[in-house]
Amino acid sequence: MGNAPAKKDTEQEESVNEFLAKARGDFLYRWGNPAQNTASSDQFERLRTLGMGSFGRVMLVRHQETGGHYAMKILNKQKVVKMKQVEHILNEKRILQAIDFPFLVKLQFSFKDNSYLYLVMEYVPGGEMFSRLQRVGRFSEPHACFYAAQVVLAVQYLHSLDLIHRDLKPENLLIDQQGYLQVTDFGFAKRVKGRTWTLCGTPEYLAPEIILSKGYNKAVDWWALGVLIYEMAVGFPPFYADQPIQIYEKIVSGRVRFPSKLSSDLKHLLRSLLQVDLTKRFGNLRNGVGDIKNHKWFATTSWIAIYEKKVEAPFIPKYTGPGDASNFDDYEEEELRISINEKCAKEFSEF
């Protein structure tokens, strides 16, 4: 009987590997055959803005025919071109239409018109983790652990497909009706087999190797996980300053201060993730994600139960019914002006 847990772990590991192998096949098919123009703008009633970005906004919309509610990301083609983000947007759409995992937001439709690109995703009504964190200050360790486990599984899935997210942060984690997470915003995500060099992401969350303009790999997402867990448990990120350059200096120095209230297990995990030396960073070693999933801080986590959403969430967002957007901030609304001539046709031909 002594080795029963080890046998169970091995069986679980094998079933995870089987799942990931099948998921890879499904992903590669959709990656190689991307869906185009699966709806049109007149099929949706635009209700209100849920969020704003540099070249567009996300709106709550209702499908006229089915009555279903969705989150529609509307991107201004000319602004995307001006800000040299064409490749990022094409990547985002191609990745979103090919992935399928419980903790990743799902793309339902995509289309374009003369002026805009549209990504229509499932609507996640609980709002951003960022807003929740601001409201409560910080999460207890069990609460942070519940969320962190879902991000670990999502990143494990993405990495098995050679995808790097590159922008994991509380603003990009939405809370669903059950209190589980949905990772959103794949604007910086990229399919990379080896290394890549692009400087992108959010200052507080950038790994040192990105700042130092070294080629970097998937390990940047595990660094970002460390920043995320720290921010959830402490209430602010580990590397913080007024100017990005000061933040970068702190990140590259690798010095992290831990409040005494954190458990020793959590401090150990964070030191292993916020590790400047890539040959020592958890997630990037011989055991891969195993070093993270088998860490003492996750000792009480049942990974299968989390994946199947069988664990009771520590927080359930208020939700009065379809179309309730009270968990999102208010924004000024403005009319979409659609040109009579097609803009940037060449740049977005494959969208």
Curated annotation (Swiss-Prot):
Name the SUPFAM superfamilies on file: Protein kinase-like (PK-like)
Family affiliation: Belongs to the protein kinase superfamily. AGC Ser/Thr protein kinase family. cAMP subfamily.
Q: Supply one GO molecular-function term.
A: ATP binding
> Under what name is this protein listed?
cAMP-dependent protein kinase catalytic subunit gamma
Q: Name one Pfam family in it.
A: Pkinase
The broad enzyme category this protein falls into is transferase
Q: What residues form the membrane-spanning segments?
A: none
Q: Quote the catalytic residue positions.
A: 167 (proton acceptor)
Instruction: Sum up the protein's function in the record's words.
Output: Phosphorylates a large number of substrates in the cytoplasm and the nucleus.
Keywords, A to Z?
A: ATP-binding, cAMP, Disease variant, Kinase, Lipoprotein, Myristate, Nucleotide-binding, Phosphoprotein, Serine/threonine-protein kinase, Transferase
Phosphothreonine occurs at which residues? 198
Residues that the record marks as modified (Phosphoserine) are 339
What does the subunit comment say? Answer: A number of inactive tetrameric holoenzymes are produced by the combination of homo- or heterodimers of the different regulatory subunits associated with two catalytic subunits. cAMP causes the dissociation of the inactive holoenzyme into a dimer of regulatory subunits bound to four cAMP and two free monomeric catalytic subunits.
Could you tell me what reaction this enzyme catalyses? L-seryl-[protein] + ATP = O-phospho-L-seryl-[protein] + ADP + H(+); L-threonyl-[protein] + ATP = O-phospho-L-threonyl-[protein] + ADP + H(+)
Write out the N-myristoyl glycine lipidation residues.
2
UniProt binding sites for ATP: 50-58, 73
Q: Which PROSITE patterns match?
A: AGC_KINASE_CTER, PROTEIN_KINASE_ATP, PROTEIN_KINASE_DOM, PROTEIN_KINASE_ST
Q: Which disease is it linked to?
A: Bleeding disorder, platelet-type, 19: A disorder characterized by increased bleeding tendency due to platelet dysfunction. Clinical features include epistaxis, hematomas, bleeding after tooth extraction, and menorrhagia.
Q: Which organism is it from?
A: Homo sapiens (Human)
Give tissue specificity per the record: Testis specific. But important tissues such as brain and ovary have not been analyzed for the content of transcript.
Quote the cellular component terms of the Gene Ontology held in the record.
cAMP-dependent protein kinase complex; ciliary base; cytosol; nucleoplasm; nucleus
Which SMART domains does this entry report, sorted A to Z? Answer: S_TK_X, S_TKc
Write the Enzyme Commission number(s) for this entry: 2.7.11.11
Q: Where is the Protein kinase domain?
A: 44-298
Instruction: Outline the extent of the AGC-kinase C-terminal domain.
Output: 299-351
Q: Which GO terms describe its biological process?
A: high-density lipoprotein particle assembly; male gonad development; renal water homeostasis; signal transduction; spermatogenesis; vascular endothelial cell response to laminar fluid shear stress
